[in-house]
Amino acid sequence: MSPDVSSSPSFDRAFCDDLERLFAWPRDVRRFSSCPLPSGALEQLVALTAYAPPVGYSQPSRFVSVCDTARRTAVIDDYERANAEAEATYPNARRATYTALKLAGLREAPVHLAVFVDTATTRGEGLGRRSMPEMLAYSTVLAVHTFWLAARARGIGVGWVSIVDPSVVARVLDVPAAWSLVAYLCVGYPQEEHLDRELSRNGWEDAESAATTLVER
C-alpha cells in the first residue's frame, strides 16, 4: 500500500532518532542464513526504490533477480578470479589481512540481485544530464541505497559485491547492451549482527572523522 503523501508529513523526534539509528547500523552484510525471504518481500523492496530521486525523472534502474544456478555459479567464478587478482596486488602483510576478510556472501545468500542502469532510456529526455551524464548512474546508486535502507529496516541484510567484472556479469545475465552494471547484491537474513563495521573489526580501515569531510570556501 502506498503511503499517504497528500500533505506534508511531520516527523517527530522519535522518528528522527530511529532514522539516525538506521543510518548508523552497519548495513554491509556478508554472512547470511539460508532462510528464504518471505513471498513478495523482494518485489516490495524493489518497488520502494521508485521513491529514490532519479535525474530528470528518468527512472533508469533495472533489477535482475538471478535465480538460475548456472548463472549464479558463473558470477561466483568471476568473483573468485577478480578477488584473487585483487589479493595479489597487496604487499605480504596487508595481503594476509585481505585474505582473512570475508568480502562476499555469494554462496550463502538466498537472493542474488543485479542492478543495472539503462543508459539508453529516453525517459526525462536527458534533463539534468547534459553537463553531468554520470547522473544517470548516480540515480541508480540512490535506488540501491534506498533498497538497502528499506531492507535493513525490515531485518533483511544486503551485501554489495564490487569484486566482479561488470562486462562478465552482463554477459552471464544476458541483458541488453545498453544496461551497465552498478551493483551486484547479496540479499537475505543476516547470520549474525554487529554494532561495528567488519572492516574496522578486522583491522582493515577505521572510520574517518566527519570533521575532515566538510570544508568551507
Can you describe what each PLM-predicted range is?
Residues 1-36, 41-44, 48:
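N-terminal targeting/leader regions
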Residues 2-15, 28-29, 183-217:
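C-terminal helix-cap and adjacent tail motif
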Residues 22, 112-114, 184-186:
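Conserved hydrophobic/aromatic beta-strand scaffold that supports enzyme active sites
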Residues 49-50, 113, 119-172:
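Small-aliphatic-rich amphipathic alpha-helix that forms the alpha element of a beta-alpha
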Residues 51-56:
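Glycine-rich phosphate/pyrophosphate-binding beta-alpha loops
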Residues 59-140:
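Glycine/small-residue-rich phosphate/adenosyl-binding loop
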Residues 83-91, 103, 174-197:
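A glycine-rich helix N-cap at a beta->alpha junction
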Residues 109-111, 154, 181-183:
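Generic beta-strand structural signal
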